[in-house]
Structures are given as C-alpha cells and as structure tokens.
C-alpha cells in the first residue's frame, strides 16, 4: 500500500503519523519507498521526519493572518502554488491513500487528492477541530478522531470513526527500559514521585510556580522530578544556586526516556497537548493539567476538561496557577491513595491500546475502494 501522510507545525500533527508509519512497517503493510511525508520546510516536521529515515517532501504554504489582512495576498499566492505542487507530488507518487492530521500543508495535499479521486482521510487528535481538518472534513472519505467533542464539529456523521491517538499504541509497544529512580536520578523508589514538565522546551508559567514552591515542596513526604525544558534550564540553574532545596527535588533539562519514566510516577504535572494525553491515558498515569493558553482555539483547555470530566485529571487554568493551587493539587493526588487509584482507572479507561491498528484498518478499507 502506497501512502502519503501530511501534517505540519506542531508535534500533535506529526507524532501520530510517525506512530502509524512505525506500525505499517512492523506489519509489513508498507515498505520504506511506499511511504511519503509531505510537510513544510519551516515546521518541526522538517527535522523529525528526515531524522527518522522517512521520505520527505515539502510544500511552501502559510496560514491566514487575521491581524494584517494585506499579508494574505501572499498567503493566497502561496496557496495557489501549493495546490500545483501538491498535484505534482500526487501524480509522481501515485498513493493508494492520503492521510492528513492538520496544519495548512495537509489542507493542500489532501484536498487535491480528493479532487483526483484518491482515497483520503484525516485524523483529529484534539477535542477542538483545527481549521485545516474542519475544511477537509467536507471532502475526505473518512474522519478518525480521539475526543467525542471533536466529532460533534463534523456534520457528516457517516464518515466518523473513533480510533484514539496512534501514539497510545506506540507508547505501549515500545517496551521501554524502566528508569531506575535511584541509579539514574538519585531518588528514593519507595516514596511517591511527581514529574513536573512543560514539554521539550519547557513552560515559563510552570517553571515560575515551581521556583516559588520549592520551599514548600521540600517539606512534603514525596519527591519531585522537575524537567525545566532545554530553553529554560541554564537560567533556572543559576537561580537555584541561591536556593536551599534538598535532594528530594531533582532538576533536569529534559526527559529522554519518557515511556520508561511515566510508569514509575505517582502523578504528572503537565501541559495538555494531544500527544502527551495519549501517553498518559495509555499508561493510566494520574495527571494535573495546566493547559497552555497560547494555542489556537484554546484547544489544550478543551482537551484537559475532557479528561477532568472523565475523572482522569485535575485541571488548573494558568490564570489560577499559584503556589497554593499548585502544591495543594499535588497533595490531593499524592496523599489520597483512593483518589489516586480512581484516577488511574479512569485514565486507563480513556486510553486506546490499539489506536494505530484502528486507523490502519480504515486506511485499508478506503484503499480497497480505489
């Protein structure tokens, strides 16, 4: 089966595709030369995809600028060129299926594929549907989704298939080496441990509240792993030189082996991007979510609220984030074992351990109709 994948800009658009590619190869459904990822030169995908050894081509495209309307003249010009480039890629590669996960680049290639009568589908990882996926929903053959709230935004219900996020299955199948809390991090494996992190680059609001909470956290009967993010690590290290905190708080720039660490955690404090939530629910990890307000359509808050409604998370809005709400939320989770266990069960119930297989099943079905 020959497949073109497209998604751009953020990890939430890229990592589900990478999980699908891995599974397609594992099952012998696709060979390396039967898979193509179409993205942009500027997006995160331009680094991640080629580094993984996946065939990669680019389309030059940008989104509409709602503040500076004159900039949209260039946007329209780029879109017209993008559709021409998309046609060339499709004609050259001759895919059996084209799947998009979001981002303007996927809008161009998936739309053109649908016009050429090539089987098409999209996958929506968030609880709020992005602009590209909302547009493409009218043209594709199938729509895969993770959150029920997202399904409500698509008018053509016959196209909908609830599959979950492919990253869930990938995390469970990694067989990652468990992190040795004592040997690797100098922590006590016998006491509760909380991981605090804001993504690979870090989150300023989370780092600020951690700095303010250190003196209170050192008094607690649990320990903390604080992943500051690579962007903030050096500055925080300088500030910590004058702070009297003890060995129960381990400060690191980044977590290299997240699948190996998460099962060892009593709870996690995190942003609420779709990929992270797929990992948490797959493993049944209790979470305190601090959604980023700096995302389109406030989708991280909607993602987080869906988990909270299911009893799988506590949510702190960034506007409400302070030392008191932060520490008291951790206390509530770590010091009440019955609450912790209920949240683990609720989180695990939301996970989809065969999400990749479910998406691939849909891919095969629409490819047969070609």
UniProtKB/Swiss-Prot annotation:
Entry keywords, A to Z: Cell cycle, Cell division, Cell membrane, Cell shape, Cell wall biogenesis/degradation, Glycosyltransferase, Membrane, Peptidoglycan synthesis, Transferase
Leader sequence segment: none
UniProt-annotated binding residues for UDP-N-acetyl-alpha-D-glucosamine: 10-12, 126, 200, 255, 300
Catalysis performed (reactions): Mur2Ac(oyl-L-Ala-gamma-D-Glu-L-Lys-D-Ala-D-Ala)-di-trans,octa-cis-undecaprenyl diphosphate + UDP-N-acetyl-alpha-D-glucosamine = beta-D-GlcNAc-(1->4)-Mur2Ac(oyl-L-Ala-gamma-D-Glu-L-Lys-D-Ala-D-Ala)-di-trans,octa-cis-undecaprenyl diphosphate + UDP + H(+)
BP terms from Gene Ontology: carbohydrate metabolic process; cell division; cell wall organization; lipid glycosylation; peptidoglycan biosynthetic process; regulation of cell shape
Gene3D superfamilies for this protein: Glycogen Phosphorylase B
Subcellular compartments: Cell membrane
Pathway stated in the Swiss-Prot or TrEMBL entry: Cell wall biogenesis; peptidoglycan biosynthesis
HAMAP family: MurG (MF_00033)
Function: Cell wall formation. Catalyzes the transfer of a GlcNAc subunit on undecaprenyl-pyrophosphoryl-MurNAc-pentapeptide (lipid intermediate I) to form undecaprenyl-pyrophosphoryl-MurNAc-(pentapeptide)GlcNAc (lipid intermediate II).
PANTHER family named among the record's database cross-references: GLYCOSYLTRANSFERASE, UDP-N-ACETYLGLUCOSAMINE--N-ACETYLMURAMYL-(PENTAPEPTIDE) PYROPHOSPHORYL-UNDECAPRENOL N-ACETYLGLUCOSAMINE TRANSFERASE 1
NCBIfam families: murG
Protein name, entry field: UDP-N-acetylglucosamine--N-acetylmuramyl-(pentapeptide) pyrophosphoryl-undecaprenol N-acetylglucosamine transferase
Organism (species): Lactobacillus delbrueckii subsp. bulgaricus (strain ATCC 11842 / DSM 20081 / BCRC 10696 / JCM 1002 / NBRC 13953 / NCIMB 11778 / NCTC 12712 / WDCM 00102 / Lb 14)
């Amino acid at each position: 089966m020959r497949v073109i994948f497209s998604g751009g800009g953020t990890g939430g658009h890229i990592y589900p595709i990478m999980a699908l590619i891995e599974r397609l190869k594992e099952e012998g459904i696709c060979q390396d030369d039967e898979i193509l990822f179409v993205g942009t030169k500027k997006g995160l995908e331009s680094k991640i995809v080629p580094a993984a050894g996946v065939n990669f081509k680019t389309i030059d495209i940008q989104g509409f600028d709602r503040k500076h309307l004159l900039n949209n003249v260039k946007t329209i010009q780029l879109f017209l060129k993008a559709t021409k480039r998309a046609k060339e890629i499709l004609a050259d590669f001759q895919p059996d299926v084209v799947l998009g996960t979001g981002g303007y680049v996927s809008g161009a290639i998936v739309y053109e594929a649908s016009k050429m009568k090539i089987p098409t589908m999209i996958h929506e990882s968030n609880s709020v549907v992005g602009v590209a996926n909302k547009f493409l929903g009218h043209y594709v053959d199938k729509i895969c989704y993770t959150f029920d709230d997202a399904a409500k935004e698509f008018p053509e219900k016959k196209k909908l298939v609830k599959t979950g996020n492919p990253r869930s299955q990938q995390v469970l199948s990694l067989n990652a080496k468990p992190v040795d809390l004592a040997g690797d991090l100098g922590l006590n494996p016998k006491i509760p441990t909380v991981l605090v992190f804001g993504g690979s680059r870090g989150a300023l609001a989370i780092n600020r509240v951690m700095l303010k909470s250190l003196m209170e956290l050192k008094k607690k009967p649990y320990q903390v792993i604080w992943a500051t993010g690579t962007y903030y690590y050096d500055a925080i290290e300088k500030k910590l030189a004058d702070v009297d905190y003890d060995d129960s708080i381990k400060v690191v720039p980044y977590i290299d082996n997240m699948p190996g660490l998460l099962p060892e955690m009593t709870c996690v404090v995190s942003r609420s991007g779709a990929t992270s939530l797929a990992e948490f629910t797959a493993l049944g990890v209790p979470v305190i979510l601090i959604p980023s307000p700096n995302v389109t359509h406030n989708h991280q808050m909607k993602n987080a609220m869906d988990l909270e409604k299911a009893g799988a998370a506590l949510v702190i809005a960034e506007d409400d984030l302070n030392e008191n709400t932060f520490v008291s939320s951790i206390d509530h989770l770590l010091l009440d074992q019955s609450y912790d266990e209920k949240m683990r069960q609720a989180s695990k119930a939301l996970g989809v351990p065969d999400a990749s297989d479910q998406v691939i099943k849909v891919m095969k079905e629409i490819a047969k109709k070609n």
